[in-house]
Amino acid sequence: MGLLSVDLLITLQILPGFFSNCLFLALYDSVVLVKHVLLQLNRSKSSHGQWRRMLTPEGLRCVWNSFLLDAYKQVKLGGDAPNSNVIHVTDKNSSSGKPGTPCHLLDFASSERPLVVNFGSATUPPFISQLPAFSKMVEEFSAVADFLLVYIDEAHPSDGWAAPGISSYEVKKHRNQEDRCAAANKLLEQYSLPPQCQVVADCMDNNTNAAYGVSFERVCIVQRQKIVYLGGKGPFFYNLQEVRQWLELTFGKKAESGQTGTEK
């Protein structure tokens, strides 16, 4: 099968999901518009904010590119985990490197323990909303598993496809590696993670994003350098509950550090 035929086949596979996402964005904009008009009619103070549409040319490009990333990703369930280039953001007293030091994703994987890798950015609402659940998971299972947060390209930068609603802070597009690491540090200032979770940033070539088909957010589990769990494409199929279920089935529900330590 020629390259053109492969690209055409992938495009045909992408189209249904792409159009369903566009329909969702159109419905979302319609609901927000009606709410905005009603608030204006009621002269509510909350109606004075700027109304941001989601179904925009920039939004369509981002959604389409997200499906392309997912379609062309290197990672496969049961396959080898890509050893992508990343940059240290936190040290956490680790001997593997200091903040700002280049490293590889699999540097954080041990020989036997599973490595839970959570990909996302501060401007991705589903990722942010599940950070507390992720932190709790780290605390409960850090005795039997390792955890890594990979900060990627912004999902909704303030100078790009900005998300509607009031955000605790805004982040612009990353112009260099310093911008990306600064955004990751800003996230950690507001959402403190347990010290057992390491934090790295994707390089500016977005090689990790491309290899794992992240785009907005994704989660996977690496064990013995193989992908033993591969979460769905975000935002609609980003599900930390499935990760918890995998850990519970593998290690049991009583995997907290204290309990595991006493049982040993």
Swiss-Prot record:
Q: Which organism is it from?
A: Aquarana catesbeiana
* Single Gene Ontology MF annotation: thyroxine 5'-deiodinase activity
Topology Lumenal: residue spans: 1-7
Q: Which residues form the active site?
A: 124
What reaction(s) does this enzyme catalyze? Answer: 3,3',5-triiodo-L-thyronine + iodide + A + H(+) = L-thyroxine + AH2; 3,3'-diiodo-L-thyronine + iodide + A + H(+) = 3,3',5'-triiodo-L-thyronine + AH2; 3'-iodo-L-thyronine + iodide + A + H(+) = 3',5'-diiodo-L-thyronine + AH2; 3,3'-diiodothyronamine + iodide + A + H(+) = 3,3',5'-triiodothyronamine + AH2
- Full protein name: Type II iodothyronine deiodinase
* Gene3D superfamilies hit by this protein: Glutaredoxin
Give the EC number.
Answer: 1.21.99.4
What do we know about how this protein assembles, alone or with others? Predominantly monomer. Can form homodimers but homodimerization is not essential for enzyme activity.
Q: How is its activity regulated?
A: Not inhibited by N(6)-propylthiouracil.
Tissue expression summary: High levels seen in the metamorphosing tail.
A single Gene Ontology biological process assigned to it is:
hormone biosynthetic process
How is this protein annotated for GO cellular component? Answer: endoplasmic reticulum membrane
Q: Which PANTHER family match?
A: IODOTHYRONINE DEIODINASE (PTHR11781), TYPE II IODOTHYRONINE DEIODINASE (PTHR11781:SF20)
Q: Locate the transmembrane regions by residue number.
A: 8-28
Cytoplasmic-side positions: 29-264
| UniProt-listed InterPro entries | Iodothyronine_deiodinase, Iodothyronine_deiodinase_AS, Thioredoxin-like_sf
Q: How does it sit in the membrane?
A: Single-pass type III membrane protein
Q: Where in the cell is it found?
A: Endoplasmic reticulum membrane
Any idea which UniProt keywords this protein has? Endoplasmic reticulum, Membrane, Oxidoreductase, Selenocysteine, Thyroid hormones biosynthesis, Transmembrane, Transmembrane helix
Name the protein family.
Answer: Belongs to the iodothyronine deiodinase family.
